[in-house]
Design a protein with these regions (language model features):
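A generic structural signal for short coil/turn motifs at secondary-structure boundaries
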Residues: 53-56, 137-140, 180
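Conserved catalytic-core segment of NTP-binding enzymes
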Residues: 64, 68-71, 75, 81-164, ...
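C-terminal boundary of histidine-terminating zinc-finger modules
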Residues: 172-188
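P-loop/Walker-type NTP enzyme "switch/lid" segment
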Residues: 1-71, 172-173
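Residue-level signature of catalytic and energy-coupling elements of molecular machines
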Residues: 6, 23, 46, 79, ...
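Short, conserved glycine- and acidic-residue-centered signature motifs
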Residues: 58, 62, 108, 186
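Conserved phosphate/pyrophosphate-binding and hydrolysis machinery centered on Walker-type P-loop NTPases
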Residues: 55, 59, 88, 183
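A short, charged, Gly/Pro-tolerant segment at domain boundaries
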Residues: 192-196, 205-217
């Protein structure tokens, strides 16, 4: 429902034949529209429709699709559009809990605070926080908001932290999910988030500065 590019990030764009609109219009079945990841047997993507504005979709159909998916899957993630507009409201209609992803800058935090308020008003009270693109050098220089300050300002449980790293861009361009890229220490961030989401008690991954930042920072 968001930027409609998850197929690229997963490296499966060439295998997409149908999308969610095809399912809604009865062109194909839900099972045929789902694209299975070649590396992970239990990871599937239901592609968004790239040719139509997401706000024009009748989301009562999305709710029916989610009901069907819940019969087969333990976790269903709905990628919400950016901003607080109709697409966002439609996306959360089918959600029972939410993960709010925020950068540690004041603008992003303010937007996230509004989102959390809306989620609460829609009775989505199980809301967790992921802080993205954390740059430890900027925090050390006091030019970026600390992780603790973000948690205090938003006042929801922290699910995990993703540190700013070139591996994120590299893996996105290669269509490799960082969660399965074992060569990257950012992999541990994603793995720990998934474990905490599943109820496991694991510590947050500590970030690291580059050697140049440590020597000359």
């Amino acid at each position: 429902m968001g930027l409609k590019n998850l197929d690229i990030m997963l490296g499966i764009e060439s295998r997409v034949v149908f999308d969610i609109l095809d399912v809604i219009n009865g062109v194909t079945t839900l099972n045929k529209a789902l694209v299975k990841d070649k590396r992970l047997d239990n990871l599937f993507l239901l592609p968004a429709c790239k040719s139509i504005d997401v706000t024009k979709i009748n989301f009562s159909y999305l709710e029916k699709i989610i009901v069907e998916l819940r019969k087969e899957f333990d976790f269903i993630f709905i990628d919400s559009p950016a901003g607080i507009e109709r697409g966002f409201y439609n996306a959360i209609r089918s959600a029972s809990e939410a993960i709010v992803v925020v950068n540690n800058d004041i603008t992003s935090i303010r937007d996230a605070d509004k989102v959390i308020g809306i989620l609460n008003s829609q009775s989505i009270l199980d809301t967790k926080l992921v802080i993205n693109k954390v740059n430890l050098k900027k925090i050390d220089e006091s030019t970026s908001i600390t992780i603790d300050d973000v948690i205090d300002l938003l006042n929801i449980p922290l699910l995990g932290v993703i540190y700013e790293d070139d591996d994120v861009i590299r893996c996105n361009n290669l269509g490799i999910p960082l969660a399965i890229e074992s060569k990257s220490y950012i992999n541990k961030c994603y793995c720990n988030i998934s474990k905490r989401l599943n109820g496991e008690d694991v510590r947050l991954v500590k970030g690291k500065m580059s050697i140049f930042a440590r020597l000359f920072g």
